Amino acid sequence: MSFVTENPWLMVLTIFIINICYVTFLTMRTILTLKGYRYIAASVSFLEVLVYIVGLGLVMSNLDHIQNIIAYAFGFSIGIIVGMKIEEKLALGYTVVNVTSAEYELDLPNELRNLGYGVTHYAAFGRDGSRMVMQILTPRKYERKLMDTIKNLDPKAFIIAYEPRNIHGGFWTKGIRRRKLKDYEPEELESVVEHEIQSK
């Protein structure tokens, strides 16, 4: 490690990279722990501590120059962003999407079921009259596709998405794992809806 300590700019780069790795693992472990993935979180914590032992000792012993302190702080902030981005790409867990729509004639529940989603729907009443509320459980990796599908089917729908803490009972989780969700283009969705309306 002497060649690193002797070169000030190489030291800055080393501090920056090591802190990115360390904080990335730290952020991912925290998120995974909160989501209940305890064994994956434990595996990530092993890598986190490994980086800490191997690299952070070098980092902390060379924070005597302003450029090293800036590299440490900048690496810390970038590490948080990188960790969150990785977790977003992994898209672990499920999302519940609540949809409120006034378009009864579109038969959105069956349209979404035909696309492979599990839908529970019921009637509700708002300020401007009756509404249809749908509750949809989907893996997080399909959340964006589901949101885009709903917006294409009903651009005026009111949508809320959140992550459930616990899931128990029902066919939702197993059904979604087995079910292959269809991926239609916006033009295809419009033709499907028009065909459904004309057939009624």
Swiss-Prot record:
Provide the alphabetized UniProt keywords.
Cell membrane, Membrane, Transmembrane, Transmembrane helix
Gene Ontology, cellular component aspect: plasma membrane
Q: Where is the signal peptide?
A: none
How does the protein's chain sit in the membrane according to the entry?
A: Multi-pass membrane protein
Q: Where in the cell is it found?
A: Cell membrane
Q: Please state the protein's primary subcellular location.
A: membrane
**Matching InterPro entries:** DUF2179, DUF5698, UPF0316
Pfam families per record: DUF2179, DUF5698
**Regions that span the bilayer:** 8-28, 40-60, 66-86
The record, for NCBIfam families, names: PRK04164.1-1, PRK04164.1-5
Q: Which family does it belong to?
A: Belongs to the UPF0316 family.
Entry protein name: UPF0316 protein USA300HOU_1913
